[in-house]
Amino acid sequence: MALFTRSNPAPTTDQAKTAADIVDPPVARPTIAAPARPSIVAPPPPTDRQNQLTQLKVKLHQQLVERLDMQNLRTLPAETVRREVRELIRELCRSEKGLISSSEQERLMDEVMDETFGLGPLESLLKDPTVSDIMVNRWDRVYVERKGRIELSDVTFRDNTHLRQIIDRIVGMVGRRIDETQPMCDARLSDGSRVNAIIPPLALDGPAMSIRRFGTKPLQLEDLIRLGAFPAAVMDFLAAAVQARCNIIISGGTGSGKTTLLNCLSRYIPADERVITIEDAAELQLQQPHVVRLETRPNNIEGRGEVTQRDLVKNCLRMRPDRIIIGECRGGETLDMLQAMNTGHEGSMTTIHANSTRDAMARLEVMIMMSGYEIPVKAMRQMISSAVNIVIQANRLTGGRRKVTRVSEITGMEGDQLCMQDLFAFEQSGVDENGMAVGRFVCNGMRPRCADRIEHRGIRLPSDLFMRRVIET
């Protein structure tokens, strides 16, 4: 007999209370002046010479495609290809009757190479190690994030058609498609960078694209300490919790560093454990030898063949995993993940979108409802209470600085309510002269229930780790 009945009705009155049990009355607030709108200086319009070089680049690219055996070139070493293309470009440039200087010729060669074998104008940004995000709003508006701050770059595409060609090239590399019938697509680059693209009719100003980059060398928890994400005391506890096979959920907003933190925590999974990762677009970088990576698949052109995260969670339970890591829970797979945590797959981890550790619990309830099963609220909360041990909140603060702002533990149930206690928290006191958030980390003096579990695994924690205090960073 099935434990739950399958249905798709609207949530009951009892279920509708899960997001917030109490609604506060409106409170009069003082009027606050809107902050000054930052001015973004658009790049200057191209000069006649720049337009001439752009037209020449297009012409050279077309001639290269006509004269080179592209299929054969892709199998040759990069240096051999570069040498052959260099000679051909020089030959083509000579036909321009000396109108191109040697420096312009070198630059044209690099740009034509990028256009032919790379991702066109994006190549210069992808080679820049300081760029963490690339946001293409339209063909002539490309923004980047450097050190937490967003700025307008001088990179542009020729037009919407050129941008669409690059998008098609990216999604084609991972066997996906984007067109009017499927105008949104997730993909990844060869270096693991995550790509999301959207085209008209959904994107009103032309194709748009976002690229989340990941360093070639995965960050470690020690790197996050150096960057000020959290102090060493928090790292000691989180590393011990992973080794002791606590189930962990990382909560946060877009760009708050959830995936980076998940990658860092995975470093402490013992090498002899079998780990299965499940993602929509593969971006986790686990370093253990015994890892199986699974990725979802969208429908094909006939509208069939979709494989969802929920399908993969159900399948991976037959693959004898010690731990399951889901890149991000968004829907009904949350129920399957919690059931796996409750049935012997301890030490599993995932991320979700929420604004606080307590909001994360409400989000879990909502996503359980999305599974299509009619489960009483109390049963959902009991499931969460028995499955999840630690909830970590990551935030992108004022000025772009990313921090772990709270580490909480689920302590059980009191009546129908889920109970949590905060172990560590970041208290923001303001901003510095550079507009960056400043504050202090505090330990709330609560000894976690999982501390005994950690010690039973033979892991020794500092005696003063959970003492109530301000933590030095």
Can you say where each PLM-predicted feature lies in the sequence?
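N-terminal anchoring/assembly modules that precede and organize ATP-driven motor systems
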Residues: 1-151
